[in-house]
Each structure stands twice: as structure tokens, then as C-alpha cells.
């Protein structure tokens, strides 16, 4: 027999299944739609050859702009009703966490999560959050953020350091695990598509990789770790231009030099290029193409 068990996180979190169920069991994390699945939902067929055709690329780019904003929550994509995402957040996230962990002051829980959602993809420290919220305890902030991660709503990553102690101490970065929630829940009037692009890239990387960010003299968005070694460095920039090109490229090349890598990846919204700097190969690829090539 096969049993598929579902339920509210207020009742049972995935990490507790092993202690509650006897015998063998497999946990399968069902994530929001990938870009390829989004295209399939739209009835748009894509293959490795077609993504290089001009007429196909125009259509794909149009769909990608929608995916970047709306994310991949299936019910929301089908009915286009923002209330569906609001309800998931209020019922599954806020209420379930409050019940499961017996949070008395739901207002400060909500305040913290609102702050993080409005500052996604940015660096933060627990003390900086303490200064801008009404939460007086760093330990409470840590606990509240861990609750959010356990519901698969968000994820924090560390600055890479060979010292685990420094990883814990240094600033974190916060990502929401579906862009649709950002669009619906963020209080910001102007939407920064650059941050949305970075958040989307993180979610793809987070599915299969251990991810850190790099910060030295310059910064690089993502480091991919496999078997305790840095295997890839990735910078995300919505559009390379005269104002940001030096900063973005130098952050990437500094990380490449630091970890002795010959190649680096710079993901953009639509630009594509390849160039060599100081013997280092930098490949510039649109995120939509990178997402589809990863799945082929």
C-alpha cells in the first residue's frame, strides 16, 4: 500500500514525520511551478531547439515577465485572484505558526514578517531587525524566522566563510519562496524587478543546491557549494548598464579569484554575452533561457 499524508503545519511539520511515523517513508516537497511548468500551464510547448528561434523567444519573454511577477502558485495562476495568496499567507503561515508555536503576540510576528517580505533579497542582521521592530529579544527574532522557514514560505542564507561560527554571526539574506507572495504582500509602491529576478534565481538554486552569498571588497549574489567546495559563482543583474556594469562584474570576478574558478555566470533579464577579464570567462545569460536550459 502507498499512503499520501497531508495536513496543516500547525498539526505536524515535515521534520517531525520521522518521529511520528514508523517504518519507511519518503518526504516529497511540492514546490511552486517552475518556469517550464508555467509555460506548460499556458499551453506553450518549448524544447531545446525552439528557445533559440526569434519568434519563440518573443513569446517566451512575454510569459517570463508574467512569471517573474506572479510566481508559480498553481491556483493563483489559474484563477488570477490575489485573495488566494493572501489567504494562504494568513491561514497557513500566520495562523498556523501562532497555533503551532503558541505565539501570544501575533502582532509582532506579523510586523517581523512584513518587514522581511518588504526587504527580501537584502542583507539583514538580527540586531538591525531589533532596532526597527518592536521585538526586544534577538532570540525571539531568530525563532520567528525559523518558524517561517519551516513552513517553506521563506529561506535565509549565510555569507560564505570557512568558519561556521562566522557564518552564524554575519549578516543573512532573506528570500521568499515564491515571487507571487511578494507582489501581493509587499507594501512597496514601486516594484524593483532586479530584486524579483534575484529572488527567482535563488528559488531555482535552492531546489538542489547549498547556497551562500559572497562579500569581500565587492559582493557576489550566490555561491554554489558541493562537497564543501565552491563550484559556481553567480551574479544577478536585471540590466547591465554604464552605471552598474563595473560593480556587478568586479563582484563576480573577485569571487572567481577568491575560489580559483575560471568561469562565472552573470544572469540578466534579457542580455546575452560572453567576455574574458583577466583570464576569467564571464557568461551573460537571460534568466528565462537559463531556467529552460537547466530543465532540458
Specify the residue positions occupied by each region the protein language model found:
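Interdomain hinge/linker elements that couple catalytic modules in large macromolecular machines
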Residues: 36, 40-216
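Structural recognition of the conserved hydrophobic beta-strand(s) that form the central parallel beta-sheet
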Residues: 2-8, 29
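Short glycine-/polar-rich loops that comprise or flank the Walker A/P-loop
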Residues: 1, 22-26, 260-263
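Short regulatory helix/loop adjacent to the ATP-binding pocket of P-loop NTPases
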Residues: 11-26, 42-43
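Conserved AAA+ ATPase "SRH/arginine-finger" region at the nucleotide-binding site
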Residues: 26-36
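Short, polar loop motifs at secondary-structure junctions
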Residues: 8-15, 267-273
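A cross-kingdom feature that marks ATP-driven nucleic-acid transaction machinery
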Residues: 146-153, 157-296
Amino acid at each position: 500500500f502507498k499512503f499520501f499524508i497531508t495536513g496543516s503545519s500547525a498539526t505536524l511539520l515535515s521534520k517531525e514525520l520521522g518521529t511520528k511515523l514508523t517504518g519507511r517513508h519518503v518526504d516529497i516537497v511540492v514546490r511552486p511551478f517552475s518556469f517550464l511548468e508555467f509555460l506548460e500551464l499556458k499551453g506553450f510547448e518549448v524544447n531545446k531547439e525552439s528557445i533559440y528561434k526569434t519568434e519563440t523567444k518573443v513569446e517566451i519573454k512575454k510569459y517570463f515577465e508574467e512569471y517573474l511577477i506572479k510566481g508559480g502558485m498553481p491556483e493563483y495562476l489559474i484563477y488570477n485572484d490575489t485573495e488566494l495568496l493572501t489567504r494562504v499567507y494568513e491561514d497557513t503561515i500566520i495562523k498556523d505558526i501562532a497555533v503551532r508555536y503558541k505565539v501570544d503576540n501575533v502582532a509582532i510576528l506579523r510586523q517581523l514578517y512584513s518587514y522581511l517580505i518588504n526587504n527580501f533579497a537584502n542583507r539583514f542582521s538580527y540586531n538591525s531587525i531589533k532596532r526597527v521592530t518592536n521585538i526586544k529579544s534577538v532570540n525571539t527574532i531568530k525563532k520567528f524566522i525559523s518558524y517561517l522557514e519551516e513552513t517553506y514560505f521563506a529561506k535565509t542564507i549565510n555569507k560564505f566563510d570557512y568558519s561556521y561560527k562566522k557564518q552564524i554571526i554575519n549578516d543573512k539574506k532573506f528570500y521568499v519562496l515564491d515571487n507571487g507572495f511578494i507582489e501581493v504582500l509587499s507594501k512597496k509602491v514601486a516594484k524593483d524587478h532586479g530584486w524579483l529576478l534575484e529572488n527567482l534565481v535563488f528559488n531555482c538554486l535552492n531546489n538542489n543546491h547549498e547556497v551562500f552569498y559572497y562579500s569581500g571588497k565587492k559582493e557576489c549574489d550566490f555561491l554554489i557549494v558541493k562537497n564543501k567546495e565552491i563550484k559556481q559563482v553567480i551574479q544577478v543583474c536585471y540590466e547591465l548598464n554604464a552605471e552598474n556594469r563595473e560593480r556587478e562584474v568586479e563582484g563576480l570576478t573577485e569571487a572567481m579569484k577568491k575560489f580559483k574558478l575560471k568561469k562565472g555566470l552573470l544572469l540578466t533579464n534579457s542580455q546575452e554575452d560572453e567576455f574574458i577579464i583577466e583570464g576569467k570567462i564571464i557568461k551573460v545569460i537571460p534568466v528565462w533561457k537559463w531556467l529552460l536550459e537547466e530543465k532540458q
